[in-house]
Every structure is written in C-alpha cells, then in structure tokens.
C-alpha cells in the first residue's frame, strides 16, 4: 500500500546528491531574476524608479570593510566616496563642501548669490587643507595686530608669516601666532609681537620630510625657505591632524587641497563668474540647468574647454541618450542625470517632461560609458538603498539634496515646526528661490525682474512676466552633522555591496553589464512587504 502520509520524508532514491548542488545549478538555462538589460527594457516594463526593483543577493566571501567605494565624478577626478552635494541654496555652501570633501565626496557650491560671494566660498574650501601652501597669506612688518585678527575672522586661522614685502617669495622675518596677539591692542605693530626665532625647512624638501620636521619641532606652522631665506611655502600642523582624522578626504593629488566644485549658469555674465571661481582655485564646474540639451550649454562647454582647460566640466541635466550625445560631443567631462525626480521638484507634474530616474540613469550611463564619461545620478536619492541601486544601474556617483538638507553643515538656521527641529529646504524651481534677488549686484528693475537669479536662469525663465514654479519649498528634520551622517551612508553602502557580492563600484558595473548581477521587479505589495509593516508603533533609528 502506498505511503499517503504528507509529512513523510521524500524517498532517498528520488533525491539528488547535495554535494552536487552547484553542478546541478548550471543546468538551469538562466539565473534567478533578471539581467540589467531585461530589467530596464522600458518597452516591456515601462519607466522604473528605484523603488520598482531590487538587486538580488550574491555570494559573500569578504568583510564589508574590504569594499572600496572609490569612483570617478569626472574623467579626471577620483573620489573615495561616490557622494556629491547638490548646488542648492539650502544644501551647499562652503561648510557643506568642506565637510563632504573631508569624508571623500565633493561639494558643489550653489550660485544663487553674487559671484564674489561664491568665489569666497570656493577659496575657503581650497584654503582649508593643504600639503605645501605655496601661496600663504603673509603680512609685512608694518602690519598691525588688527590685521591678524581680521585674517582669523575671515579664514579661521592666525598663524601668519611675516616677510619683508608682506608677500611670499620675499625674505622671512618672523611669524605671528594666536598666542602672540592675545591681549594685544589692535593697533600694536606686528614687528613688536612676532616670533623672530623661527624653525624652518629648507627647499627643496619632500612633504613627508616636512611633516616629520613639523612633528619633531611641535610647532604649529613650518615655513619652507630657499637658500636666500625667502619664503617659498608653508606646512601646517592642522593639516597633519586632518590627514589623520579624515583618511578618505578627496584631495587634488598635487596640492593636497580639498576638491571643490561650484555651479554656474550658461548666460554671458557667467563667464565673469567663472573667472573669479577659477582664480579662487575651482576644480570642477557644474553647468546648472534643468534641461541641459541646449545651444547655450553646448557653446558654453566649448568656451570653457578653450579658456580653462584644467577645469573639469559636469554638464546636464539629461535623461536621454540623445541629450547626452550632444554634451559629450561638446566636451563634457561628466554628466548629471535627472529631470523631475527630486523630492522638491514638480517638473514632471507641471511640464509633463522628464523621465523616471531609474530608467534615465540606466539609459544615459550605458551610453556615456562607451566614451569613458562618468555619470552622476541626481535626484530621487532617499536612502542607502537608492544609492546602491543608482550605482548598480551604471552611475559612478550620486548627487544628494534632500538627503543632506537639514544637516548641521547645510545653510540656514534651525527652527521648530510642530514640535520638530527643522531647517528650510527648497527646490531651485520654487517661487521662493526664483524670488531670491541677492545673486549679483543687481538692483532696481533688474533685481525685481530676477534677471540675475540662479533659479530663473536654471529654468530659462529670467524674462518671464509670470513665474511658473517647477519646485516647492518646505522643511526637513534635523539630521545632525555630516560627520556622523556621511559615515553612516558610507558604511551602509559597503554592506549593500557585500550583500550583492561585489567589492567595488567598478566590479558592480562589470557584473551588471555581464549579467552576473541579477535584479527583480517589485509589485506594489512587494514594496509594502519590504518596508516596516504589522507594527502598532515603532522608532526608526538610522544609525548609532
């Protein structure tokens, strides 16, 4: 009589040998899930966003700490962390740019301010950390304590070399420090309080040797002089501490200064703006437009390449291969992808133009990769999972606005709304941003019409009598400091890569292209299942 017990174990003669499981796996014609190409077939699946799919897990054979997140923001700029901050006036000024660069990313300073203000912010970023400071701020012997205090108020330090002419490349007479000017009257001459017995390094000298000498002498600053006693450069102890505390900091290899980016428009006046930014030491310029495929941007790229060949150009925004091709052909060093996907953006709703971000990132990044052009996924990044998915789709880095808004380093003051500590966060297409009239020195009718406003320039609406909003203004909760938030993103992304079975961004891209990295579409109920559910109440702590 046949065994009808449903709980009985299967007969051993019907089972395969467990030791051969991997061999039998090869008999399946295809792996679980979908390849990237199958997933992103928009003719079959439509336009997809980050929440519409998942990356399937891979094989783990390494600790998460072994994962490298090094990637390119442009053809020639390598970041240790694939994070950029958005050039929005409630997200990125010099504090954000410094903090993000120290953690391996890149801050893009907004341009909804005067050119002089923007250049000053770039200069503060570039002066924050150095290897050899080849153009140190100097004072002459006739300067006063008040001059030193002014430097401290403006740049945050007061260790200043004193030279015969008050400039580098002249004879070093001494150095003045914070202790020298304490309790001194502002009118006191520097020559009466400066230290004249100065420990120096002799040029030529390696940075390693200079840093070693700085540690041995326990001084705050080490002037480097030539055989004639002329000041050649300066090395600072504060930079040694920054190197120790921020090992992933993104720096220019030659100067050891932090990388800094800034946004500009594509109007004639922006040529003068870029001149000031270049003089301040700008590394990369972002051409800021909601729709980058314009004759204005194409001509501007060509002009920048001729005038400032050492400045990298991130062009955009684009969401199609056709748009990307125009900017790549013009000479762009990187592309910014996204149109209407940001949390404060309503372009798709109002203009009926744009593209779901997942599909846009895949289409543009796949095309641009053939030319070696890195792509930045801009918009729709709400959590670590979105970052991982954007990179899996082919992006080399992500640009974040709302995710970084509300941090200590973002512009603006905290206030309380309905009992929560918040900061203002607004889209550059919002009416509030378009009505901001402090970008340039414009006044009168020009200021009233917002003819020199970054937000209106971004959306090609400077001369419009009626402003049509493509963004909103609101507030976001206090997220604390970048110094805790970015390490949380970094570590979480390392664990995401570990779960996928890849050890680097380049390996992630390679596996996605080859089909070994697999994906799965998510239904609405699958998305619901993947979030917190079934609880009466809960507390969502992101990191500790």
Curated annotation (Swiss-Prot):
Enzyme class: oxidoreductase
GO cellular component terms given for this protein: cytoplasm
UniProt xrefs under PROSITE patterns: CBS (PS51371), IMP_DH_GMP_RED (PS00487)
Annotated ranges, domain CBS: 132-192, 194-250
SUPFAM superfamilies: CBS-domain pair, Inosine monophosphate dehydrogenase (IMPDH)
Location within or outside the cell: Cytoplasm
Pathway of action: Purine metabolism; XMP biosynthesis via de novo pathway; XMP from IMP: step 1/1
Family: Belongs to the IMPDH/GMPR family.
Oligomeric and partner information: Homotetramer.
Record's protein name: Inosine-5'-monophosphate dehydrogenase
Organism classification: Eukaryota, Fungi, Dikarya, Basidiomycota, Agaricomycotina
């Amino acid at each position: 009589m046949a065994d009808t017990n449903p709980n009985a174990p299967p007969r051993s003669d019907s089972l395969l040998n467990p030791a051969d499981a991997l061999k039998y796996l090869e008999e399946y014609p295809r792996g679980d899930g979908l390849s990237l190409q199958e997933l992103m077939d928009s003719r079959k699946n439509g336009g997809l966003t980050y929440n519409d799919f998942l990356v399937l897990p891979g094989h783990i054979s390494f600790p998460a700490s072994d994962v490298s997140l090094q990637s390119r923001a442009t053809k020639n700029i390598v970041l240790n962390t694939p994070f950029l901050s958005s050039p929005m006036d409630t997200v990125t000024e010099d504090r954000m740019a410094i903090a993000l660069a120290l953690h391996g990313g890149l801050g893009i300073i907004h341009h909804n301010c005067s050119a002089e203000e923007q250049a000053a912010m770039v200069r503060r970023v570039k002066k924050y950390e150095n290897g050899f400071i080849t153009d140190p701020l100097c004072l002459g012997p006739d300067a006063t304590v008040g001059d030193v205090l002014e430097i401290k108020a403006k740049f945050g330090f007061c260790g200043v070399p004193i030279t015969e002419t008050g400039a580098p490349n002249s004879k070093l007479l001494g150095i003045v420090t914070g202790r020298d000017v304490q309790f001194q009257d502002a009118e006191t001459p520097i020559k009466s309080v400066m230290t004249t017995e100065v420990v120096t390094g002799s040029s030529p000298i390696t940075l390693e040797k200079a840093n070693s000498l700085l540690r041995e002498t326990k001084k705050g600053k080490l002037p480097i002089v030539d055989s004639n006693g002329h000041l050649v450069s300066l090395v600072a102890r504060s930079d040694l501490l920054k190197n120790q505390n921020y090992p992933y900091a993104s720096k220019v290899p030659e100067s050891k200064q932090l990388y800094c980016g800034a946004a500009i428009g594509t109007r004639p006046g922006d040529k003068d703006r870029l001149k000031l930014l270049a003089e301040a030491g700008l590394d990369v310029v972002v051409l800021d437009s909601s729709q980058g495929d314009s004759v204005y941007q194409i001509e501007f790229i060509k002009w920048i390449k001729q005038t400032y060949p050492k400045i990298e150009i991130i062009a955009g925004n684009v969401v199609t291969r056709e748009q990307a091709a125009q900017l790549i052909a013009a000479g762009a060093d990187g592309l910014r992808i996204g149109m209407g996907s940001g949390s404060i953006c309503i372009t798709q709703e109002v203009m009926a133009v744009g593209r779901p971000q997942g599909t846009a990132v895949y289409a543009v990044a796949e095309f641009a990769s053939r030319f070696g052009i890195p792509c930045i996924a801009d918009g729709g990044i709400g959590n670590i999972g979105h970052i991982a998915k954007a990179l899996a789709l082919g992006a080399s880095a992500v640009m974040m606005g709302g995710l970084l808004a509300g941090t200590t380093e973002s512009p603006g003051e905290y206030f309380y709304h309905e009992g929560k500590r918040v900061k203002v966060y607004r889209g550059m297409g919002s009416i509030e941003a378009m009505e901001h009239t402090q970008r340039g020195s414009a006044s009168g009718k020009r200021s009233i019409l917002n003819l020199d406003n970054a937000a209106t320039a971004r959306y090609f609406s400077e001369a419009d009598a009626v402003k049509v909003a493509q963004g909103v203004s609101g507030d976001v909760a206090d997220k604390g400091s970048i110094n805790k938030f970015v390490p949380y993103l970094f570590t979480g992304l390392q664990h995401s890569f570990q779960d996928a079975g890849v050890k680097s961004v380049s390996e992630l891209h390679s596996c996605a292209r080859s089909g070994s990295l697999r994906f799965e579409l998510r239904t609405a109920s699958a998305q619901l299942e993947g979030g917190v559910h079934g609880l009466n109440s809960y507390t969502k702590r992101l990191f500790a």
